[in-house]
Amino acid sequence: MDPYSVIIKPQLSEKTMNQIYDENKITFVVRRSANKRVIKEAFQDLYDTKVVGVNTHITPRGNKVATIELEEADAAEDIAVRLGVF
């Protein structure tokens, strides 16, 4: 599956911004049919960084959200800066 079709956009809120700083995690809205393995591979292909784990949930609006924990220190901040979140 194409990595660009799996990861749709970053999920931005006060909670996700705190996770970027405190827990080295970044949150994205992803394709509903994607599983954790596909999300992990797509993220590693797009951003060239090692993923420790992926947690997913479906929001009441029907969007699938993936919280991705990164291995390297401050990697979430670097990716957020590249995406223009800050």
Swiss-Prot record:
Keywords: Ribonucleoprotein, Ribosomal protein, RNA-binding, rRNA-binding. The keyword Membrane does not apply. InterPro entries: Nucleotide-bd_a/b_plait_sf, Ribosomal_uL23, Ribosomal_uL23-like, Ribosomal_uL23/eL15/eS24_sf. GO terms for molecular function: rRNA binding; structural constituent of ribosome. The keyword Ribosomal protein applies. GO terms for cellular component: ribonucleoprotein complex; ribosome. Transmembrane segments: none annotated. One of its GO terms (biological process) is translation. It comes from the Archaea. Pfam families: Ribosomal_L23 (PF00276). Binds to 23S rRNA. One of the proteins that surrounds the polypeptide exit tunnel on the outside of the ribosome. Belongs to the universal ribosomal protein uL23 family. Part of the 50S ribosomal subunit. Contacts protein L29. This is Large ribosomal subunit protein uL23.
